[in-house]
Design a protein with these regions (language model features):
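Short loop/turn motifs at secondary-structure junctions and domain boundaries
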Residues: 49-55
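Conserved GNAT-fold acetyl-CoA-binding loop/helix
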Residues: 28-48
């Protein structure tokens, strides 16, 4: 377990999943992240794969002993990415920045992150953690859905 201040990273427990499910359903969070919410079956299938995939490195974020969200890294099309999600009640407290900084001490590989250009809070988190803009892209957030302008951020490994 990684601990510093009031933010802790630990292995994901099965009991975290219902909290993650509700967090990813929040309309404000979905709108800000420009991400789609999964229904229960799709969510369960997604996390079942994550939890057994040896390439995925994922941690639960706790704040004051409450499950605040998750942070993880994964491979996609030959690149290593990092992503994080916080429940709305944990926004604006510096939790995402602290959690990502702690995570980066454990996963020291070169990482990329995609962030919607409209997601200013997440852009600030990435920049505070040493990520810089490496490019931009348009990405469909759902099959057949609208496309979103993304920044591609990158942070070198050590």
């Amino acid at each position: 377990m990684l601990e510093s201040g009031l933010v802790t990273l630990r292995d994901v427990a099965e009991t975290d999943l219902p909290i993650f499910f509700e967090q990813q359903r929040d309309p404000d969070a979905v709108r800000m992240a420009v991400f789609f919410s999964r229904d229960r079956n799709a969510f369960d299938a997604h996390w079942a794969k994550i939890l057994v995939d040896p390439v995925v490195f994922v941690k639960t974020i706790e704040f004051q002993k409450n499950v605040a969200g998750n942070v993880g890294s994964f491979e996609l099309q030959g690149q290593r990415y990092v992503g994080y999600w916080l429940g709305k009640g944990f926004w604006g407290k510096g939790i995402a920045t602290q959690a990502l900084m702690k995570f980066l001490r454990e996963d020291r590989r070169r990482l990329q992150a995609r962030v919607a250009k409209s997601n200013i809070a997440s852009i600030r988190v990435l920049e505070k953690c040493g990520f810089t803009i490496a490019g931009e892209d348009r990405l469909a957030i759902q099959p057949g859905g609208e496309e979103v302008d993304d920044w591609v951020y990158e942070r070198g490994g050590s």
